[in-house]
Protein backbone atom coordinates (compact mmCIF):
# COMPACT_ATOMS: atom_id res chain seq x y z
CA UNK A 1 0.00 0.00 0.00
CA UNK A 2 1.15 3.51 -0.80
CA UNK A 3 0.50 4.76 2.74
CA UNK A 4 2.88 2.11 4.10
CA UNK A 5 5.63 3.17 1.69
CA UNK A 6 5.16 6.82 2.65
CA UNK A 7 5.27 5.84 6.33
CA UNK A 8 8.54 3.96 5.77
CA UNK A 9 10.08 7.03 4.15
CA UNK A 10 9.05 9.28 7.04
CA UNK A 11 10.23 6.93 9.79
CA UNK A 12 13.50 5.81 8.23
CA UNK A 13 14.42 9.37 7.29
CA UNK A 14 13.81 10.52 10.87
CA UNK A 15 15.85 7.64 12.30
CA UNK A 16 18.93 8.90 10.46
CA UNK A 17 19.27 11.56 13.15
CA UNK A 18 19.25 9.34 16.25
CA UNK A 19 22.07 10.31 18.63
CA UNK A 20 21.96 7.57 21.26
CA UNK A 21 22.37 3.86 20.63
CA UNK A 22 22.52 1.74 17.49
CA UNK A 23 19.48 0.34 15.69
CA UNK A 24 19.57 -2.31 12.98
CA UNK A 25 16.30 -2.93 11.13
CA UNK A 26 15.50 -5.80 8.80
CA UNK A 27 12.60 -4.94 6.51
CA UNK A 28 9.98 -7.40 5.27
CA UNK A 29 11.81 -7.68 1.93
CA UNK A 30 15.06 -8.61 3.70
CA UNK A 31 16.79 -5.25 3.25
CA UNK A 32 18.85 -4.23 6.29
CA UNK A 33 19.06 -0.61 7.49
CA UNK A 34 21.40 0.70 10.18
CA UNK A 35 21.00 3.84 12.28
CA UNK A 36 23.14 5.45 14.95
CA UNK A 37 26.62 4.63 16.16
CA UNK A 38 27.63 0.92 16.07
CA UNK A 39 30.14 1.59 18.86
CA UNK A 40 27.35 2.46 21.31
CA UNK A 41 26.65 0.06 24.20
CA UNK A 42 22.90 0.17 23.55
CA UNK A 43 22.45 -1.99 20.44
CA UNK A 44 19.04 -3.11 19.20
CA UNK A 45 17.95 -5.39 16.37
CA UNK A 46 14.40 -5.16 15.01
CA UNK A 47 12.88 -7.33 12.31
CA UNK A 48 9.71 -6.03 10.69
CA UNK A 49 7.16 -8.79 10.09
CA UNK A 50 4.28 -6.67 8.84
CA UNK A 51 4.50 -3.71 6.46
CA UNK A 52 2.00 -1.68 8.50
CA UNK A 53 4.42 -1.25 11.44
CA UNK A 54 5.71 2.23 10.59
CA UNK A 55 2.23 3.42 9.66
CA UNK A 56 1.04 2.30 13.12
CA UNK A 57 3.89 4.25 14.76
CA UNK A 58 3.03 7.38 12.82
CA UNK A 59 -0.67 7.00 13.49
CA UNK A 60 -0.63 6.08 17.17
CA UNK A 61 2.85 6.50 18.69
CA UNK A 62 3.47 4.26 21.72
CA UNK A 63 0.00 2.75 21.35
CA UNK A 64 0.87 1.74 17.79
CA UNK A 65 4.18 0.23 18.89
CA UNK A 66 2.53 -1.71 21.71
CA UNK A 67 -0.30 -2.97 19.52
CA UNK A 68 2.21 -4.02 16.87
CA UNK A 69 4.13 -6.01 19.48
CA UNK A 70 0.92 -7.66 20.66
CA UNK A 71 0.12 -8.63 17.05
CA UNK A 72 3.65 -9.91 16.28
CA UNK A 73 4.22 -7.22 13.62
CA UNK A 74 7.88 -7.13 14.66
CA UNK A 75 10.42 -9.08 16.68
CA UNK A 76 13.40 -7.67 18.55
CA UNK A 77 16.37 -9.00 20.46
CA UNK A 78 15.41 -6.90 23.51
CA UNK A 79 12.08 -5.11 23.86
CA UNK A 80 13.15 -3.00 26.83
CA UNK A 81 16.30 -1.85 25.02
CA UNK A 82 14.25 -0.97 21.94
CA UNK A 83 11.93 1.23 23.97
CA UNK A 84 14.87 2.73 25.87
CA UNK A 85 16.51 3.64 22.57
CA UNK A 86 13.33 5.39 21.43
CA UNK A 87 13.03 7.14 24.80
CA UNK A 88 16.60 8.43 24.71
CA UNK A 89 16.01 9.72 21.18
CA UNK A 90 12.58 11.12 22.00
CA UNK A 91 13.07 14.35 20.03
CA UNK A 92 13.83 12.31 16.92
CA UNK A 93 10.91 9.96 17.57
CA UNK A 94 8.57 12.94 17.96
CA UNK A 95 9.25 13.75 14.29
CA UNK A 96 6.99 10.85 13.33
CA UNK A 97 5.38 9.38 16.45
CA UNK A 98 1.65 10.00 16.37
CA UNK A 99 1.82 12.73 13.73
CA UNK A 100 -1.32 11.33 12.07
CA UNK A 101 -3.03 11.57 15.44
CA UNK A 102 -5.30 14.51 16.20
CA UNK A 103 -3.97 16.39 19.27
CA UNK A 104 -7.10 18.54 19.49
CA UNK A 105 -9.31 15.45 19.74
CA UNK A 106 -7.09 14.02 22.47
CA UNK A 107 -7.21 17.34 24.32
CA UNK A 108 -11.02 17.35 24.20
CA UNK A 109 -11.18 13.72 25.37
CA UNK A 110 -8.95 14.53 28.33
CA UNK A 111 -11.19 17.43 29.28
CA UNK A 112 -14.45 15.47 28.92
CA UNK A 113 -13.38 12.12 30.42
CA UNK A 114 -12.62 13.07 34.02
CA UNK A 115 -11.79 10.90 37.02
CA UNK A 116 -15.04 11.46 38.89
CA UNK A 117 -15.64 9.24 41.92
CA UNK A 118 -17.58 6.67 39.89
CA UNK A 119 -15.15 6.69 36.98
CA UNK A 120 -12.20 6.38 39.37
CA UNK A 121 -13.76 3.21 40.80
CA UNK A 122 -14.23 1.84 37.28
CA UNK A 123 -10.64 2.68 36.33
CA UNK A 124 -9.20 1.04 39.43
CA UNK A 125 -11.35 -2.05 38.94
CA UNK A 126 -10.11 -2.52 35.37
CA UNK A 127 -6.55 -2.92 36.61
CA UNK A 128 -6.29 -3.85 40.27
CA UNK A 129 -9.34 -6.11 40.23
CA UNK A 130 -7.71 -8.41 37.68
CA UNK A 131 -7.52 -10.59 40.76
CA UNK A 132 -5.50 -10.98 43.93
CA UNK A 133 -4.40 -14.41 42.71
CA UNK A 134 -2.97 -12.86 39.54
CA UNK A 135 -0.86 -10.25 41.32
CA UNK A 136 0.25 -12.63 44.09
CA UNK A 137 1.90 -14.90 41.51
CA UNK A 138 4.56 -12.39 40.51
CA UNK A 139 4.77 -9.73 43.23
CA UNK A 140 6.92 -10.38 46.30
CA UNK A 141 5.38 -11.69 49.52
CA UNK A 142 4.58 -8.17 50.76
CA UNK A 143 2.25 -7.98 47.72
CA UNK A 144 3.57 -4.50 47.01
CA UNK A 145 2.79 -3.07 43.56
CA UNK A 146 5.08 -0.04 43.70
CA UNK A 147 8.80 0.47 43.38
CA UNK A 148 11.19 -1.00 45.89
CA UNK A 149 14.27 0.91 47.06
CA UNK A 150 17.39 -1.24 47.20
CA UNK A 151 20.13 -0.67 49.78
CA UNK A 152 22.44 -2.90 47.73
CA UNK A 153 22.16 -4.47 44.25
CA UNK A 154 22.01 -7.90 45.90
CA UNK A 155 19.13 -7.07 48.24
CA UNK A 156 16.04 -9.27 47.88
CA UNK A 157 12.89 -7.59 46.56
CA UNK A 158 10.99 -8.33 49.78
CA UNK A 159 13.64 -6.55 51.86
CA UNK A 160 13.85 -3.67 49.39
CA UNK A 161 10.08 -3.14 49.59
CA UNK A 162 10.26 -2.91 53.38
CA UNK A 163 13.22 -0.57 52.96
CA UNK A 164 11.02 1.65 50.77
CA UNK A 165 8.35 1.70 53.47
CA UNK A 166 10.91 2.69 56.10
CA UNK A 167 12.30 5.53 53.97
CA UNK A 168 8.80 6.98 53.59
CA UNK A 169 8.17 6.63 57.32
CA UNK A 170 11.45 8.43 57.98
CA UNK A 171 10.08 11.35 55.94
CA UNK A 172 6.95 11.74 58.08
CA UNK A 173 8.66 10.96 61.45
CA UNK A 174 5.73 9.48 63.42
CA UNK A 175 5.78 9.25 67.22
CA UNK A 176 3.82 7.06 69.63
CA UNK A 177 0.08 7.65 69.57
CA UNK A 178 0.06 9.57 66.28
CA UNK A 179 -2.95 9.29 63.98
CA UNK A 180 -1.90 8.49 60.42
CA UNK A 181 -3.73 8.31 57.08
CA UNK A 182 -2.65 6.26 54.07
CA UNK A 183 -4.27 7.35 50.79
CA UNK A 184 -4.37 4.32 48.49
CA UNK A 185 -3.40 1.32 50.63
CA UNK A 186 -3.14 -1.36 47.95
CA UNK A 187 -3.10 -4.83 49.50
CA UNK A 188 -2.03 -3.50 52.88
CA UNK A 189 1.76 -3.92 52.81
CA UNK A 190 2.57 -0.48 54.19
CA UNK A 191 -0.24 -0.74 56.74
CA UNK A 192 1.12 -4.05 58.04
CA UNK A 193 4.69 -2.73 58.21
CA UNK A 194 3.73 0.51 59.97
CA UNK A 195 1.24 -1.15 62.31
CA UNK A 196 3.73 -3.87 63.28
CA UNK A 197 6.67 -1.57 63.96
CA UNK A 198 5.08 1.62 65.35
CA UNK A 199 2.62 2.44 68.14
CA UNK A 200 0.24 4.49 66.00
CA UNK A 201 -3.38 4.55 64.81
CA UNK A 202 -3.70 4.14 61.06
CA UNK A 203 -6.62 4.75 58.68
CA UNK A 204 -6.08 3.28 55.20
CA UNK A 205 -8.34 3.93 52.23
CA UNK A 206 -8.79 2.26 48.85
CA UNK A 207 -11.52 2.23 46.20
CA UNK A 208 -10.66 -1.28 44.98
CA UNK A 209 -13.06 -3.89 46.36
CA UNK A 210 -10.57 -6.72 45.82
CA UNK A 211 -7.77 -4.83 47.57
CA UNK A 212 -10.06 -3.85 50.44
CA UNK A 213 -11.09 -7.46 51.07
CA UNK A 214 -7.50 -8.71 50.97
CA UNK A 215 -6.07 -5.89 53.11
CA UNK A 216 -8.86 -6.22 55.69
CA UNK A 217 -8.18 -9.95 56.08
CA UNK A 218 -4.42 -9.33 56.14
CA UNK A 219 -4.66 -6.85 59.01
CA UNK A 220 -6.96 -9.21 60.93
CA UNK A 221 -4.55 -12.12 60.37
CA UNK A 222 -1.66 -9.99 61.72
CA UNK A 223 -3.62 -9.06 64.84
CA UNK A 224 -3.56 -5.36 64.01
CA UNK A 225 -7.31 -4.58 64.08
CA UNK A 226 -6.90 -2.31 67.11
CA UNK A 227 -4.32 -0.17 65.30
CA UNK A 228 -5.23 -0.31 61.60
CA UNK A 229 -8.59 0.50 59.99
CA UNK A 230 -8.99 -0.42 56.29
CA UNK A 231 -11.83 1.42 54.52
CA UNK A 232 -13.35 1.66 51.06
CA UNK A 233 -13.40 5.41 50.59
CA UNK A 234 -12.55 7.99 47.93
CA UNK A 235 -9.91 10.48 49.09
CA UNK A 236 -12.32 13.31 48.22
CA UNK A 237 -14.69 12.09 50.97
CA UNK A 238 -12.14 12.40 53.78
CA UNK A 239 -13.13 14.70 56.65
CA UNK A 240 -10.76 14.24 59.58
CA UNK A 241 -7.44 15.44 60.95
CA UNK A 242 -4.22 13.43 60.89
CA UNK A 243 -0.77 13.95 62.34
CA UNK A 244 0.76 12.37 59.25
CA UNK A 245 -0.40 11.39 55.76
CA UNK A 246 1.31 8.84 53.50
CA UNK A 247 0.55 7.99 49.88
CA UNK A 248 2.51 5.54 47.73
CA UNK A 249 2.11 5.78 43.95
CA UNK A 250 -1.57 6.66 44.20
CA UNK A 251 -1.25 10.16 42.77
CA UNK A 252 -0.83 8.66 39.27
CA UNK A 253 -4.49 7.54 39.43
CA UNK A 254 -5.79 10.99 40.42
CA UNK A 255 -5.89 12.46 36.90
CA UNK A 256 -4.82 15.86 35.64
CA UNK A 257 -8.12 17.53 36.50
CA UNK A 258 -8.04 16.40 40.13
CA UNK A 259 -4.50 17.14 41.27
CA UNK A 260 -5.78 20.27 42.96
CA UNK A 261 -8.43 18.22 44.81
CA UNK A 262 -5.79 15.71 45.91
CA UNK A 263 -3.53 18.32 47.50
CA UNK A 264 -6.50 20.23 48.88
CA UNK A 265 -7.66 17.04 50.59
CA UNK A 266 -4.20 16.60 52.10
CA UNK A 267 -4.19 20.21 53.31
CA UNK A 268 -7.66 19.96 54.87
CA UNK A 269 -6.99 16.66 56.65
CA UNK A 270 -3.54 17.52 58.03
CA UNK A 271 -3.01 18.91 61.53
CA UNK A 272 -1.19 22.29 61.65
CA UNK A 273 2.11 20.64 62.62
CA UNK A 274 1.56 17.50 60.56
CA UNK A 275 3.80 16.00 57.88
CA UNK A 276 3.14 14.24 54.57
CA UNK A 277 5.19 11.60 52.76
CA UNK A 278 4.44 10.83 49.11
CA UNK A 279 5.99 8.40 46.63
CA UNK A 280 5.17 9.36 43.05
CA UNK A 281 6.07 8.70 39.44
CA UNK A 282 6.69 11.91 37.50
CA UNK A 283 7.29 12.75 33.86
CA UNK A 284 10.12 15.05 32.83
CA UNK A 285 9.06 18.69 32.72
CA UNK A 286 10.31 19.06 29.14
CA UNK A 287 7.92 16.30 27.97
CA UNK A 288 4.91 17.32 30.04
CA UNK A 289 3.08 19.61 27.60
CA UNK A 290 3.05 17.01 24.84
CA UNK A 291 2.23 14.16 27.23
CA UNK A 292 -0.75 15.84 28.90
CA UNK A 293 -2.70 16.17 25.63
CA UNK A 294 -2.01 12.71 24.20
CA UNK A 295 -2.98 9.23 25.34
CA UNK A 296 -0.12 6.72 25.59
CA UNK A 297 -0.02 2.92 25.72
CA UNK A 298 -0.38 2.76 29.50
CA UNK A 299 -3.45 4.97 29.54
CA UNK A 300 -5.00 3.01 26.67
CA UNK A 301 -4.37 -0.54 27.89
CA UNK A 302 -3.19 -0.61 31.50
CA UNK A 303 -4.29 2.35 33.63
CA UNK A 304 -7.34 4.09 32.15
CA UNK A 305 -7.51 7.52 33.75
CA UNK A 306 -3.85 7.40 34.74
CA UNK A 307 -1.76 10.55 34.52
CA UNK A 308 1.84 11.36 35.44
CA UNK A 309 2.41 14.87 36.80
CA UNK A 310 5.71 16.64 36.24
CA UNK A 311 7.76 17.90 39.18
CA UNK A 312 6.90 21.45 38.16
CA UNK A 313 3.20 20.61 38.11
CA UNK A 314 3.44 19.06 41.57
CA UNK A 315 5.21 22.14 42.92
CA UNK A 316 2.46 24.37 41.52
CA UNK A 317 -0.30 22.46 43.34
CA UNK A 318 1.72 22.16 46.53
CA UNK A 319 2.19 25.94 46.61
CA UNK A 320 -1.42 26.63 45.61
CA UNK A 321 -2.75 24.62 48.55
CA UNK A 322 -0.61 26.22 51.24
CA UNK A 323 1.88 23.39 51.60
CA UNK A 324 5.67 23.43 51.63
CA UNK A 325 8.03 20.93 50.02
CA UNK A 326 10.72 19.71 52.39
CA UNK A 327 12.90 16.69 51.68
CA UNK A 328 13.03 15.24 48.16
CA UNK A 329 14.77 12.11 46.84
CA UNK A 330 14.92 10.49 43.39
CA UNK A 331 14.94 6.71 42.83
CA UNK A 332 14.45 6.13 39.09
CA UNK A 333 17.11 3.42 38.90
CA UNK A 334 15.41 1.51 41.69
CA UNK A 335 12.18 1.38 39.72
CA UNK A 336 13.85 0.05 36.59
CA UNK A 337 15.42 -2.69 38.74
CA UNK A 338 12.05 -3.48 40.33
CA UNK A 339 10.44 -3.75 36.90
CA UNK A 340 13.15 -6.09 35.63
CA UNK A 341 12.49 -8.42 38.57
CA UNK A 342 8.71 -8.25 38.06
CA UNK A 343 9.05 -9.02 34.34
CA UNK A 344 11.34 -11.97 34.96
CA UNK A 345 8.97 -13.46 37.55
CA UNK A 346 5.91 -12.73 35.37
CA UNK A 347 7.43 -14.68 32.47
CA UNK A 348 8.61 -17.47 34.77
CA UNK A 349 5.10 -17.83 36.23
CA UNK A 350 3.29 -17.48 32.89
CA UNK A 351 2.04 -21.09 32.83
CA UNK A 352 0.31 -20.52 36.17
CA UNK A 353 -1.00 -17.10 35.10
CA UNK A 354 -2.37 -18.63 31.89
CA UNK A 355 -4.42 -21.10 33.93
CA UNK A 356 -6.33 -18.12 35.37
CA UNK A 357 -7.77 -17.48 31.91
CA UNK A 358 -5.29 -14.97 30.48
CA UNK A 359 -4.28 -15.40 26.84
CA UNK A 360 -1.11 -14.76 24.83
CA UNK A 361 -2.27 -11.27 23.81
CA UNK A 362 -2.56 -10.39 27.51
CA UNK A 363 0.95 -11.75 28.10
CA UNK A 364 2.44 -9.63 25.34
CA UNK A 365 0.50 -6.58 26.54
CA UNK A 366 2.01 -6.97 30.01
CA UNK A 367 5.49 -7.65 28.64
CA UNK A 368 5.25 -4.41 26.69
CA UNK A 369 3.86 -2.51 29.69
CA UNK A 370 6.64 -3.62 32.04
CA UNK A 371 9.35 -3.04 29.41
CA UNK A 372 7.85 0.36 28.50
CA UNK A 373 8.04 1.50 32.13
CA UNK A 374 11.52 0.06 32.65
CA UNK A 375 12.84 1.95 29.62
CA UNK A 376 11.17 5.16 30.79
CA UNK A 377 13.03 5.07 34.10
CA UNK A 378 16.34 4.06 32.51
CA UNK A 379 16.14 6.98 30.07
CA UNK A 380 15.07 9.35 32.90
CA UNK A 381 12.04 10.46 30.88
CA UNK A 382 10.12 9.42 33.97
CA UNK A 383 11.33 9.47 37.55
CA UNK A 384 10.40 8.00 40.92
CA UNK A 385 10.47 10.43 43.82
CA UNK A 386 9.77 10.42 47.53
CA UNK A 387 9.11 13.81 49.07
CA UNK A 388 7.76 15.30 52.27
CA UNK A 389 5.35 18.18 52.79
CA UNK A 390 4.15 20.29 55.68
CA UNK A 391 1.94 23.30 56.15
CA UNK A 392 3.46 26.66 55.27
For each of these PLM feature ranges, what is it?
Residues 273-281:
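Conserved beta-strand signature within the Rossmann-like core of class I S-adenosyl-L-methionine
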Residues 176-184:
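Conserved class I S-adenosyl-L-methionine
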Residues 236-245:
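A short acidic, Gly/Pro-enriched loop at the edge of an enzyme's catalytic core
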Residues 187-199:
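Conserved SAM-binding loop of SAM-dependent methyltransferases across substrates and taxa
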Residues 1-162, 167:
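Feature captures hydrophobic
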Residues 260-272:
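A short glycine-rich, Lys/Arg-flanked "PGG" loop and its adjoining helix->strand segment in the class I
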Residues 215-216:
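Conserved SAM-binding loop
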Residues 282-392:
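Substrate-binding/catalytic lobe of Class I Rossmann-like enzymes that use SAM or dcSAM, i.e.
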Amino acid sequence: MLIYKISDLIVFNALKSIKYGFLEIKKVNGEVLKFGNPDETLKVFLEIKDESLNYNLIKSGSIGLGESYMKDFFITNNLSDLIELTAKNIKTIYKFSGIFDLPFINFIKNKIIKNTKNRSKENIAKHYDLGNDFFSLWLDKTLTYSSAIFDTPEQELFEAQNNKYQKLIDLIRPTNGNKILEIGCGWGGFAEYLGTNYDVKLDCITISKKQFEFAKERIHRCGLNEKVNIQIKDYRDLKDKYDHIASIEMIEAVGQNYLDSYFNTIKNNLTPSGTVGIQAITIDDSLFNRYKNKKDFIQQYIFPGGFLPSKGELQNYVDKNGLKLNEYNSYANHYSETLIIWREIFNKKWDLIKKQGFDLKFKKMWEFYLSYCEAGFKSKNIDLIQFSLQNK
